[in-house]
Amino acid sequence: MKIEQAKKEHAHDIALLIMLAMTDECCMNMVGPGKTLADFEQVMTDLASSECSQYSYRNTLVALTDDNRVAGAIVAYRGEDLHALRKAFLDAAKERLGRNLDNITDETEAGEYYIDSVAVYPDFRRMGIASSLLRAAIERAHSNGLPAGLLVDKQNPNAERLYTALGFRYIDDKMWSGHEMKHMRCYCPE
């Protein structure tokens, strides 16, 4: 397994993995009446293949198998870039999904390298891939002089245990898309 910068050709896998991280319920909260998960998947694939969106392949690292299949992905970017990067998603939600999400809560802020999404396909779980992806994102954050930050659903104690084991610490509580979340950070070593 190797961790590499994603390429445009990985866009569909990136979209599927982001949706896996979000859960179907959360994805359906992002679409308007008469729209489906397939519609959301197409929008996310287009955003992942774009140059400037929070879900762009440019903001993504992928875990590749020996035969170059995508096993997992992690999407991360500088918190200060959230609004500029999110614009493409908000525009697509309005135009293609029939949903105005302009009032969505900010999940990050300036001063952190935000891990937006991390997921591994079910067939590749329990192999340390999520940990490897997270370590790579933490390293990228620290090389930029920033702590790595993320949100974890309070209903997902397994993910919280993993993040804690990798050095993340609780900062505060946040609400995001109707879910109670814990904001955690992994600071640069002194």
Regions found by a protein language model. Give the residues of each.
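A short helix-loop-beta-strand connector motif used in the catalytic cores of GNAT acetyltransferases and
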Residues: 47-62, 80-85, 114
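A short beta-loop-alpha structural element at the N-terminal edge
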Residues: 2-17, 23-29
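Conserved beta-strand in the GNAT
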Residues: 62, 69-78, 114, 119
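Conserved GNAT acetyl-CoA-binding A-motif
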Residues: 111-113, 141-153
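Conserved acetyl-CoA-binding loop-helix of GNAT-fold acetyltransferases
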Residues: 120, 126-139, 161-165
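Conserved beta-strand-loop-alpha-helix junction that forms the acyl-donor binding cleft
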Residues: 115-125, 150-159, 176-181, 186-189
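Conserved acyl-donor/pantetheine-binding loop and adjacent beta-alpha core of acyl/acetyltransferases
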Residues: 78-113, 117
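Conserved GNAT-fold acetyl-CoA-binding loop/helix
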Residues: 25-48, 94
